[in-house]
Amino acid sequence: MASSCSPSAGSLQVSLCLTVAFTLARSAAGTVDDAQSFALQSAEPYVKEGFQVREDYWGGDLGSGEKKAVRQQLFKGNEYWFWMGTEVERAKISVHIYDSEGKLAEQPDSWEKGHFAAAHVIPKGTGSYFVIVAVEESPEERTHWALVYGFR
C-alpha cells in the first residue's frame, strides 16, 4: 500500500507530511541564519587586518525599499566595521552609519556589492550611533538580512 498525504491518511501521517512540507519550504526560502553567514563572509578579510567580530548580531526581514535603524554605543579611539548580508543573491542592500545628531558618520571606504554591504566608522566621540540597514531592491517579497560588526 502506497503512503499518501491525503486527508484520509492517518493524523500522524498527515502531521509528518506537513512537517516535511514546512521544512522544505523554509529551507528553500532561507533564514536570518543564512543571511548571517553571508554577513560573516563579508567580515573575513577584515579579521585578517585585526578586527574582532562580535558574537552579537541583528537580523530580520525587510521588503524592498524598507529600512531599519539599529542603535549602537561606539567608543572614541576604536575603529568599527558593520557588515550586512542576505541570502538573496539578486537583492541590493545597504548599510549607513549616522551620529546622534543625524549626520553621516561613515568613512568613504564603506561599500555595497549586491547582497553584501559594509560601513566603516571611526567615531569622533563616544556615544550612540545609528546604523541604518536597507533592502534597496529584491526579487523576494521579504528579504532576510543580518548585520554583524567588528572593532579594533
Provide a role label for each language-model segment.
Residues 1-9:
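N-terminal secretory signal peptides that target proteins for export/translocation
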Residues 11-25:
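Bacterial N-terminal signal peptides
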Residues 30-51, 97, 128-152:
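C-terminal edge strands of extracellular/lumenal beta-sandwich accessory domains
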Residues 54, 101-108:
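Surface-exposed loop/edge segments in extracytoplasmic proteins
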Residues 62-64, 69-78, 120-126:
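Extracellular and analogous surface-interaction loops
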Residues 69-87, 130-134:
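Hydrophobic beta-strand segments within beta-rich accessory/binding domains
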Residues 79, 90-94, 142-144:
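Exposed beta-strand and adjacent loop surfaces of beta-rich binding modules
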Residues 89-104:
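Short, surface-exposed beta-strand/strand-loop-strand elements in extracellular ectodomains
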